[in-house]
Amino acid sequence: MSPKTAHVQVLAPLTGVMVPIESVPDPVFAQKMVGDGFSIDPFDGTVFAPVSGEIVDLQNAHHALTIRTPEGIEILIHVGLETVSLEGRGFTPHVARGDKVAVGDKLITFDVDRVAREAKSLLTQVVVANMDAIASIRPETGMVVGGRSLAATIEPAAPKARASAGGGGEAFVGTVVIPNPTGLHARPAATLVALAKGFESDIKLASQGNTAN
């Protein structure tokens, strides 16, 4: 019998009220296209690290970032809805890509009044971006305090052997033009991820010197 993997506790990144992810007025999150998790209706504008790990992504608009835990779980925090269109206005990052953070560290501050006026919603989503890394996530309910209250418990997926991707396969390369002014973000990104999961392959994107799989 293999040993049990320890559960991962996710603290609330913001002070506010827990909201079921299915209730978020955006199908990308409500339908869990990005991943499963929870939402918070915030009372203030300070985002704390809900887990310890490495900042593996910080969006240019500073409204969203991803932390990878030591277990390999990627936690995406997305402040507000359609906040990418603010192009960083009202947001101040306190970390950079590659930084190591501990639970409770300050990640982002934002102007609550401005974001409330200029964005669709203040609802802040916290989701697991790589769902294959977990077996389940159990969100809490009610009011939570940023950096202090338990917001969810994650059961990591059992370790499994990965098949070797080396040799024997064909390589296909193509060019895609994205007319969306905000780029490959949110809904189009989630759609692409859903399509990619239908293939047993190593898929990489490259643009302007940046790459991602």
Identify the residue ranges that each predicted region occupies:
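Short amphipathic
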Residues: 10-12, 169-180
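SAM-dependent methyltransferases
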Residues: 157-175, 193, 197, 202-204
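A general secondary-structure boundary signal
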Residues: 52-55, 175, 211
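Conserved beta-strand segments of the P-loop GTPase G domain that flank and frequently precede/overlap
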Residues: 78, 177, 205-206
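Short beta-strand segments
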Residues: 73-77, 174, 212
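Amphipathic alpha-helical interaction surfaces in cytosolic regulatory modules
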Residues: 183-196, 201-204, 210-213
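Contiguous, well-folded functional domains in the mature portion of proteins
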Residues: 1-167
